[in-house]
């Protein structure tokens, strides 16, 4: 499958054919490898050895495996290491890791020498199905997440589902938030498949894992191709649940609450917000909530990071979200499972507060 300027490959083992795949995109064999500490430990030696066997010249950069690595100071340090290693425009950058590495590496590639090619090698479910696809790369600012960045399409997105077998269950459930999102916003049949084969997917059983990853990547790429720079509102539908999620993440200080966990909570809020004005039927609301009830969170997380929050403070935190215009929040809502739309009219603060209340009540009664 292809997006405007990238190619997505789902294959195991994908790294052993990276030289051949680079050639299809006209990429040279001088590559900066960006890892986080975890991916360097788990996969670094195998990736480097495989690439060197295929004739690559590589240098490696390693950052801490945390959201705070997406910062100006970290980027500045990496620029310096690349300059000292004589990296010029003939090089490319491969991001091996999750969303933090992909965002940070994409940001650096977009800005270094006014732009060098970037390749994404995602190693988490969330990155494989969402953040590595579509070319939106950014770092954080103390006043908000992903506020400073670029559109910089990866030349290649190399997806190997086998990498997921090293992940703890918390990371799998976090990634499933984005997988489920695609069923909600674009594909009722995919939603039904996830409902039927949920246990197999979260246990990483084939062929269901690869089906879920491939379908998610296809939906994301298809939306990006139709609305690369978010001019029609279609690409914004990928942010279902994210307006609430970004507010939650900001209130957590971008620590101790994973992005996927925030998105899952946010989708519950968004389902209630879709239902309250009458857009989403009761039956679809119940089906959606039934699937989201199968998520698992660390003990006490929902209470600490959502149920105990002040609702008004959460709404104010949401106002820093990128999906607002002139302090008017825009929400991605559903009118049925499998179809989303962008809505920025007639949604009052009272509506939002009530949706948060409904979600809090649901989480409490569901025993999270």
Swiss-Prot record:
GO cellular-component term (any): cytoplasm
Names of the cofactor(s): NAD(+); Co(2+); Zn(2+)
Binding-site residues for NAD(+), renumbered to this chain: 99-103, 123-124, 136, 145
Keywords: Amino-acid biosynthesis, Aromatic amino acid biosynthesis, Cobalt, Cytoplasm, Lyase, Metal-binding, NAD, Nucleotide-binding, Zinc
A Gene Ontology molecular function term of the record: nucleotide binding
Subcellular location: Cytoplasm
CDD domains according to UniProt: DHQS (cd08195)
UniProt pathway: Metabolic intermediate biosynthesis; chorismate biosynthesis; chorismate from D-erythrose 4-phosphate and phosphoenolpyruvate: step 2/7
SUPFAM superfamilies linked: Dehydroquinate synthase-like
Binding-site list for Zn(2+): 178, 242, 259
EC identifiers of the protein: 4.2.3.4
Cofactor descriptive note: Binds 1 divalent metal cation per subunit. Can use either Co(2+) or Zn(2+).
Keyword Lyase: yes
Similarity field: Belongs to the sugar phosphate cyclases superfamily. Dehydroquinate synthase family.
Role: Catalyzes the conversion of 3-deoxy-D-arabino-heptulosonate 7-phosphate (DAHP) to dehydroquinate (DHQ).
Protein name in UniProt: 3-dehydroquinate synthase
Organism of this sequence: Chlorobaculum tepidum (strain ATCC 49652 / DSM 12025 / NBRC 103806 / TLS) (Chlorobium tepidum)
């Amino acid at each position: 499958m292809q997006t405007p300027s990238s190619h997505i490959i789902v294959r195991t083992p994908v790294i052993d054919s990276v030289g051949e795949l680079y050639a299809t995109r006209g990429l040279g064999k001088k590559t900066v490898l960006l890892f986080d500490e975890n991916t360097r430990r788990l996969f670094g030696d195998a990736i480097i050895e495989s690439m060197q066997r295929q004739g690559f010249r590589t240098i490696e950069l390693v950052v801490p495996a945390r959201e705070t690595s997406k910062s100006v100071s970290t980027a500045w340090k990496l620029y310096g290491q690349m300059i000292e290693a004589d990296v010029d425009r003939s090089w490319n950058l491969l991001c091996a890791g999750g969303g933090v590495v992909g965002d940070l590496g994409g940001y650096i590639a977009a800005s270094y020498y006014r732009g060098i090619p970037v390749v994404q090698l995602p190693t988490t479910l969330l990155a494989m199905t969402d953040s590595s696809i579509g070319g939106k790369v950014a770092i954080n600012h103390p006043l908000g997440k992903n506020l400073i960045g670029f559109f910089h399409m990866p030349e290649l997105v190399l997806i190997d589902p086998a990498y997921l077998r090293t992940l703890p269950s918390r990371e799998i459930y976090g990634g499933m938030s984005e997988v489920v999102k695609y069923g909600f916003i674009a594909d009722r049949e995919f939603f039904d498949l996830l409902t039927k084969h949920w246990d197999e997917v979260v246990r990483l059983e084939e062929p269901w894992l690869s089906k879920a990853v491939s379908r998610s990547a296809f939906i994301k790429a298809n939306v990006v191709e139709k609305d690369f720079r978010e001019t029609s509102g279609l690409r914004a539908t990928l942010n279902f649940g994210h307006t609430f999620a970004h507010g939650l993440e900001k209130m957590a200080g971008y620590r101790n609450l994973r992005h996927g966990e925030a998105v899952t909570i946010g989708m519950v809020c968004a389902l209630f917000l879709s239902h309250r004005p009458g857009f989403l039927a009761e039956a679809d609301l119940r089906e959606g909530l039934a699937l989201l009830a199968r998520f698992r969170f660390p003990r006490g997380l929902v209470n600490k990071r959502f149920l105990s929050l002040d609702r008004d403070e959460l709404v104010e935190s949401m106002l820093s979200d990128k999906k607002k215009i002139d302090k008017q929040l825009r929400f991605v809502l559903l009118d049925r499972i499998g179809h989303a739309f962008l809505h920025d009219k007639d949604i009052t603060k009272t509506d939002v507060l009530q949706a948060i209340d409904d979600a809090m009540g649901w989480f409490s009664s569901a025993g999270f």
